[in-house]
UniProtKB/Swiss-Prot annotation:
The organism's taxonomic lineage, starting at the top: Eukaryota, Viridiplantae, Streptophyta, Embryophyta, Tracheophyta
Binding-site residues for Ca(2+) 3, renumbered to this chain: D469, D471, S473, Y475, E480
One term under GO cellular component: membrane
Protein name: Calcium-dependent protein kinase 26
Stored SMART domains: EFh, S_TKc
Activity regulation comment: Activated by calcium. Autophosphorylation may play an important role in the regulation of the kinase activity.
EC id: 2.7.11.1
Length: 541
């Protein structure tokens, strides 16, 4: 993500609000007064945002107005007139973030540049416009990244905002080496406070995750800042939204059902709390569809390690935030008043198990590398391999029902000579059964078995390794990893060192093929056959 998040993409695009309910109100432009400020319209948060934006535009330049930009709908202006653009800080689906310096004051800021050519349709344009409106609307709140200005030229939109030089939340937790429940409660208190502010100001974030919370500086007391409002929306009481947006682990069940409101943000924070305390997400799987199926089931594990060592108050809050019924879920205000989260509350000041930190580090640092490698492997599968899996499905589906039961799967895999333990087959079944109906249809089977197959095939792993090993030296260096992740749109400057360190078992500063294979197979069922609950805990996604 870098110093300033660069925006996420929608998993599935749909109508913003339920037909028959009001959509997020279009902003009403303020009427400019003589001094260039704008009169605020009292009707909506969007109007306030638009008025602030209009005022900024009116006062930003005294030169003749340029042509009107199609995204921000105001005169285009060159950002480099005011700022010097420096090194790259991060990269996302729609944009790149650079360090920038205000030419007059020397202040260091972050400039998020969004290429207009990547805004493929009106919805994408509306998203960027709304992001600017929302950030202006939330401007001045102490724990939200401050937008200093928005600029549009012929090719790009530039958002200039506070520079959060302290890095991501995960990085701070890991760097400290240990933390207590009380520290986790303080962290959650800050996050929920931010969301309470957003909700009270008529904004749903819709993409809450640890990566979207940054620290303003490297100081121990640096304030936490929420960022990346690219998926956020204005909302009114009772308004229902239907488009599926967000990041897989953190999406609320009602979002997947296309009928949700601000309660979805509380679910996402509940997932974050679970990760802060246990080091792994509560709902995991080998594919996005399987993650969604687990979320819809809503069964959270509060029995396996390290949960027996965690206080009853923490577990009570997790349950109430991850209540599958949004109407019964706590509000942000209620979370802030829970005994565990209060400043002088019940959270014990006892260090959490070190394994939690290790898991946090794995989940944070290895995610993008493994994701990139899996993408490469999936792309190198031949038609012949896919055809073989189709035939395998037919052979396992003995009653020709078009679906496979657990018993059919066990018998069929054994006859195919595939060496999986019962625990591994049950894991495969659960991961493959995306709709949670207890059986696997053809599409579910192919998706799941392609993954298990490719993890067990040396040639696929080697193909992926070669993709990263750009100079064919037999090693993946830091520079090669950076290049490959940039090509995949997964680059994060902050995590490269952690990725190398975690995979580099012989500590020579680079990753050889055996280390790459070990990293890829860790937690996949190929490296070790263990208790399924333990395997779940050690899985690196």
């Amino acid at each position: 993500m870098g110093q300033c998040c660069t925006g996420g993409g929608k998993a599935v695009a749909g109508d913003e609000a339920e037909p028959g309910t009001s959509k997020a109100a279009p902003p009403s432009r303020g009427t400019s007064s003589k001094n260039g400020s704008a009169k605020q319209q009292p009707c909506s948060p969007a109007a306030k945002a638009a008025a602030t934006e209009a005022a900024a535009a009116a006062s930003s330049s005294k030169k003749p107005a340029g042509p009107i930009g199609e995204v921000l709908e105001r005169p285009m202006e060159e950002v480099r007139t005011t700022y010097s653009i420096g090194k790259e800080l991060g990269r996302g689906q729609f944009g790149v973030t650079h360090l920038c310096t205000h030419k007059a004051t020397g202040e260091k800021l972050a400039c998020k540049t969004i290429a207009k050519r990547k805004l493929a349709n009106k919805e994408d344009v509306d998203d960027v416009r709304r992001e600017v409106q929302i950030m202006h609307h939330l401007s001045g709140q102490p724990n939200i990244v401050d937008l200093r200005g928005a600029y549009e030229d012929k090719h790009n939109v530039h958002l200039v905002m506070e520079l959060c030089a302290g890095g991501e939340l995960f990085d701070r937790i890991i760097a400290r080496g240990h933390y207590t429940e009380r520290a986790a409660a303080a962290l959650l208190r800050a996050i929920v406070g931010i969301v309470h502010t957003c909700h009270s100001m008529g904004v749903i974030h819709r993409d809450l995750k640890p990566e979207n919370f940054l620290l303003l500086s490297k100081g121990d007391d640096a304030p936490l800042k929420a960022t990346d409002f690219g998926l956020s929306v204005f909302f009114k009481e009772g308004e229902v939204f239907r488009d599926i947006v967000g990041s897989a682990y953190y999406i609320a069940p009602e979002v997947l059902k296309r009928k949700y409101g601000p309660e979805a943000d509380i679910w996402s924070i509940g997932v974050m709390l679970y990760i802060f305390l246990a080091g792994v997400p509560p709902f995991w799987a080998e594919s996005e569809n399987a993650i969604f199926a687990a979320i819809l089931r809503g069964q959270i594990d509060l029995a396996s390690e390290p949960w027996p060592k965690i206080s009853s108050g923490a577990k009570d809050l997790v349950r109430k935030m991850l209540n599958i019924n949004p109407k019964e879920r706590l509000t942000a205000f209620q979370v802030l008043n829970h005994p565990w989260i209060k400043e002088d509350g019940d959270a014990p000041d006892v260090p959490l198990d070190n394994v939690v930190l290790n898991r946090l580090k794995q989940f944070r640092a290895m995610n993008q590398f493994k994701k990139a490698a899996l993408r490469i492997i999936a792309g190198c599968l031949s038609e012949e391999e896919i055809k073989g899996l189709k035939e395998m499905f037919k052979n396992i589906d003995k009653d020709n029902s078009g679906t496979i039961t657990l018993e059919e799967l066990k018998n069929g895999l054994a006859k195919q000579g595939t060496k999986f333990s019962d625990n591994e087959i049950e894991q495969l079944m659960e991961a493959a059964d995306a709709d949670g109906n207890g059986i696997i249809d053809y599409e579910e089977f192919v998706t799941a078995t392609v993954h298990m197959n490719k993890m067990d095939r040396e040639e696929h792993l080697y193909t992926a390794f070669q993709y990263f090993d750009k100079d064919n030296s037999g090693y993946i260096t830091k520079e090669e990893l950076e290049q490959a992740l940039k090509e995949q749109g997964l680059y994060d400057a902050n995590e490269i060192k952690d990725v190398i360190t975690d995979a580099d078992s012989n500590n020579d500063g680079r990753i050889d093929y055996s280390e790459f294979v070990a990293m890829m197979r860790k937690g996949s069922g190929c490296a070790e056959a263990t208790n399924p609950k333990k395997k779940r805990r050690d899985l690196v996604l």
